[in-house]
Amino acid sequence: MEEFQGYLELDRSRQHYLLYPLLFREYIYAFAHDHGLNRSILFQNAGYDNKSSSIXXXXXXXXXXXXXXXXXXXXXXXQNQFFGHNKNLYSQILSEGFAVIVEIPFSLRFLFSLERKEIAKSYNLRSIHSIFSFLEDKFTHLDYVSDVLIPYHIHLEILVQTLRYWVKDASSLHLLRFFLHNYWNSFITPKKHITFFLKGNPRLFLFLYNSHICEYEYIFLFLRNQSSRLRSTSSGIFFERIHFYVKIEHFHFVKVFFDNNFQCILWFLKDPFMHYVRYQGKFFMASKDTPLLMNKWKCYLVNLWQYHFSVWFQPGRIDINQLCKYSLDFLGYRSSVRLNSSVVRSQMLENLFLINNAMKKFETIVPIIPLIGSLYKSNFCNTFGHPISKPSRTDSSDSDIIDRFLRICRNLSHYHSGSSKKKSLXRVKYILRLSCVKTLARKHKMTVRTFVKRLGSEFFEEFLTEEEVVFSLIFPRTYSTSRRLYRGQIWYLDITSINDLVNYE
């Protein structure tokens, strides 16, 4: 990174803070290939194929320096003389290099912020099952929650105008507009109500997405400060990490870092009445007492997206649900919370009267209906919960198919092991077990009955007795002990990956 800053200072002294001339520097494309640099400035390399090499990057830089004007003139022609038959390859290389250039102001600002603000670290790692548990001290005071998908179908010019506040180089903005209008359709694919980036997409569009989210949340924070007389209790930006750190008692000290598909930072806002947490392309918004505050912010968000970002967003897509009747979906895992009231009776010394203190207990439950809905989206069952085979898995080996089903079953079982009323998990295990059998029977072109007889009953024991085997290694094998452990809340600490079902939602 020091070498990168040295190159940057050299070009700044010559070009008077212009970013556009850096496009003709060959070392910029070398930095685009450097994985170490990418890790230091938060962005992962989008990846090249085997045809991409330093020679191709040098040829693209030389072509850009020699025929940049001819490329703009031939943009409307049927055969682009600048890119030729390697249009996609050269455009990808140039966009990767341009992405490194426009990241310069942001990366330097990020490094400067890290020098001023030290991130507290803890090496006592918690499992991914504590995603919801780290909010348990605050859930007891919340009543309503909204789970909203952030819209992203915005006009290309709005993206350019957003970057005008950060990048002052007009030439770079014109080149960005050229990339967007010519290669937008080849780099992104629309799905549902959000634009999902393909794995082979350039980092440029990943950068544009983060810029859009950053602009939206700055305006969101400004509206919050203008609409309330109370100052925000805490707000901040959490930079992504891979592991979850230890849960600390106070929420505004909790450091929750994770790696996600959009490479976005985690942002949260907390005040006495409203909580806001964003992850990936969604955000949670929760409040207490009445849904009046949630309806007000619903109007704010709809007007912000429609009039500022020119995104048509239907107000009906923002549902305001009671927290006790709603299941939260986070990184592929679903959890529902239930607040049980308990009374603690205490007696003052040397006094005859008793004091009853009513307390709310945070308790997670297994949301069986949303879980079956996730299995239906992943083609493990139909809409009625009847198991079906997965044709896409028939090309894999038998061991890979069984391991995949067992891993999903084990993760769901371990994740909800600390929940109450875990008997509904038997339905989920049944769907996964029978779907696995039907997939294997379809692969071997046999009936389910014939394949089960051939497989034997030992296969089903792997789905059913795993928890009992773990318990038997720790506790004595007695009926009362196993029954108490089954009903009790025991958290597993080995779930360190995102649920496989998240890839299909």
From Swiss-Prot:
Pfam families: Intron_maturas2, MatK_N. GO terms for molecular function: RNA binding. It is found in: Plastid, Chloroplast. One of its GO terms (biological process) is mRNA processing. It comes from the Eukaryota. GO terms for cellular component: chloroplast. Keywords: Chloroplast, mRNA processing, Plastid, RNA-binding, tRNA processing. Usually encoded in the trnK tRNA gene intron. Probably assists in splicing its own and other chloroplast group II introns. Belongs to the intron maturase 2 family. MatK subfamily. This is Maturase K.
